[in-house]
């Protein structure tokens, strides 16, 4: 997201600022995930040294070149999928994991946080989409990016154990 923000032109400064703010949110999210992982017995070393599965590699291979393009507004489609998924499913997943694995709230804090806070992330996205900067061409690219990211997210799960 920070890479994408650095490629948004000054004419779209409010969008650039939103991307930068969102990058900070996502950085804190990763720290929360790391804490949860350690709380269930994992280590930061494992996170740093375990290779990505092929679905994660595919997602990164798609996202980073997109973020490096001028005014990568199509990545709003990725945000729509990612934030929408968290908004709709994270609470259910937190409760299911707690029940099935007998976990404490502090071991699923990332999922619990998103159950309560992805509405604000999603609202920011909605504001951008309603701002008037999204032309027909941009809208088409946003939709295509959303479809690709949704498929690559599914691929990450399908390839969970395939490094």
How should these model regions be labeled?
Residues 1-163:
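Non-heme di-metal
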